[in-house]
Amino acid sequence: MNDITVSDAIEAIYASLKNDNEELDAHIAALKSAMAREGVKEAAFETSRLVQPNRQGRKLMQSYFRKKGVAVAFV
């Protein structure tokens, strides 16, 4: 993976979510490596920018990211 920042990786994930989860797993892997490199423990996502911003959508996203080893918070 290239040296991508956490904020760039999160932006790529927003774009992927809007494009029917295209390459989502690759973007999650990039986010995970960026978080490890920068020492960030949790990725913060804006609820208003999610495709499905309700509780069910947030919990589904949180669960999927947890399976990939990424802790998610919503603001």
What label would you give each PLM region?
Residues 1-38, 66-71, 75:
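N-terminal acidic leader/helix
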Residues 32-54:
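Acidic, low-complexity, intrinsically disordered interaction modules
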Residues 53-68:
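Short, aromatic/basic amphipathic alpha-helical patches
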